[in-house]
Amino acid sequence: GAALAPSSEGDVDLRCQNAKSCPAQLRERVAYLGSRGVLDIEALGYVAAVALTQPLEPQAAPLKSEADLFDLTLEDLLPIQAQVLDPDSGLPKLDADGNPKVVDFFRKKDGSPAEVALKLLRNLEDAKTKPLWRILVALSIRHVGPVAARSLAAHFGSLDRIFAASEAELSEVDGVGAILAQSLREWITVDWHREIIERWRASGVQLETPGHEGPGSGGAADGKFAGLSIVATGSLKQFTREQIEEAIISNGGKAASSVSKKTAFVVAGENAGSKLAKAEELGIEVIDEEEFQRRLNS
């Protein structure tokens, strides 16, 4: 295998440098991009990630990198046999006789497609139109989590514009900063990283926010909530947590996770707890969903 070394200068932890095709790293990246906070591909859990990247016959792995993900077909999935690995240790689980457990993950005993295979293909088709920030997080770029990805997506509106921006331009985006900007610029210089983007584009993945015309697109910088720090708390009926955060950010606001003196107002749903109490203690304005919707549409 490849030698272990720091990924970049200043790193304390050691990583396998064969990042593209190191099966263990690829497995973890695939499981991560399928997770709820990223592309939310329900059928792409840890066991499916193992089957796709580390099948019993390594040469038969349908995923050699993330670039292959949206090109998967039923024909790719059906032959796969895989060992069942423990998510914590990464070691094979054993059956009653002490032998590694092996499963035909994507097919039934009669050879027909298992529901998980059909569901995975449906999920992947749906994932092609996920919000831009989720696509950005799915690329597993160091330091780029959901908060920074939302800000970048709201400001630039397309993956191409994000990667065409200079470090200085990236650093100016709220929540980004110099380290993250450098990480973005370094990531896009790698050939196989660019291949992921081009293959996903060719497969029909939406790499831009429809109607967004460029930096700020007028929406964020001049939006209804421009410069405001807004907190949502409690159970909301009209919005999921993701939807209300998206509405705040795309209109220039900051979707904050905690209440402080800088908070402009709090949107409170049912069973709002400590954040509501904190807002009342600080004299911060509290509104309900209906009022938030009214301000959004005004």
Predicted segment positions?
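Feature of Fe-S/electron-transfer and energy-metabolism proteins
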Residues: A31, R36, V47, L74-L78, ...
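Short acidic (Asp/Glu) and glycine-rich catalytic loops that position anionic groups and cofactors
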Residues: E9-D13, R27-A31, Y46, F163, ...
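Conserved hydrophobic/aromatic packing and binding residues within compact polymer-binding modules
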Residues: V30, L69, I248
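DNA strand-break repair and replication-stress modules
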Residues: L33, L52, A60-A61, I80-S298
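Conserved ATP-binding/catalytic motifs of P-loop helicase motor domains
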Residues: A24-R27, L39-V47, Q54, P58, ...
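A glycine-rich phosphate-binding loop feature that marks nucleotide/adenosyl-phosphate handling sites
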Residues: D13-N18, V47-Q54, D68-D76, P92-L94, ...
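Cys/His-rich short segments
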Residues: G1-I41
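Generic low-polarity alpha-helical segments
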Residues: G1-L4, L52, P58, L69-F70, ...
